[in-house]
Design a protein with these regions (language model features):
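Noncatalytic linker/hinge segments flanking ATPase motor cores
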Residues: 25-32, 48-55, 117-124, 155-164
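C-terminal regulatory/interaction regions
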Residues: 144-169
């Protein structure tokens, strides 16, 4: 924000979290600008971002659904804002699993835009994109990998939940 003047948008839950003592002291507290909630939208030019609260990684994770285009053809994309399992507690892990299960119910998602580049085979897909020829499918348009990725997230979270439950007892 200091360097680029970026406007920050978060859920009220996560804005409230920023008022708590910082866990990561090396990051400055963000300046509060905009709040979003489940079902809210933001138009950027002709692109409409549709927001979904997907708690787990933080209590108020914000995820985004939007339309992308390949040679004029629309495809539904989704950015899951809280992929990481680097948190603790049974309740938060259950929240995460519930969020993943909710994402599994979404229809029509064809493009996975992960919030961390090492997730969702981003670099491999980028390399395929560099060699793409006319008529080749776009490597990021891959609805089957979206479903498979969510299955992996759920399985990993269920394993974490078992560990968290053992630690709590």
């Amino acid at each position: 924000q200091e360097e680029f003047g970026a406007v920050v948008m978060m859920t009220e839950t996560d804005w409230n979290m920023t008022d708590e003592p910082a866990i990561y002291q090396e990051y400055p507290k963000p300046i509060r600008h905009l709040s979003a909630s489940d079902g809210s939208t933001l138009n950027l030019g002709r692109t409409r971002l549709r927001f979904m609260e997907t708690p787990g990684h933080t209590p108020g994770v914000l995820s985004t659904r939007f339309t992308v285009y390949d040679n004029g053809y629309p495809h539904e994309a989704f950015l899951f804002g809280g992929v990481g399992l680097n948190f603790s507690g049974v309740e938060r892990t259950e929240m995460y699993i519930n969020s993943v299960q909710r994402l599994m119910q979404l229809e029509g998602i064809e493009v996975n835009i992960p919030n961390h580049a090492d997730s969702g085979e981003v670099f491999d897909r980028y390399e395929m994109l560099q060699d793409r020829q006319d008529g080749d499918p776009h490597p990021f348009v891959d609805p089957e990998s979206w479903d498979a990725w969510l299955d992996i997230l759920k399985k990993n979270a269920q394993s974490k939940l078992e560990r968290e439950q053992r630690a709590a007892n």
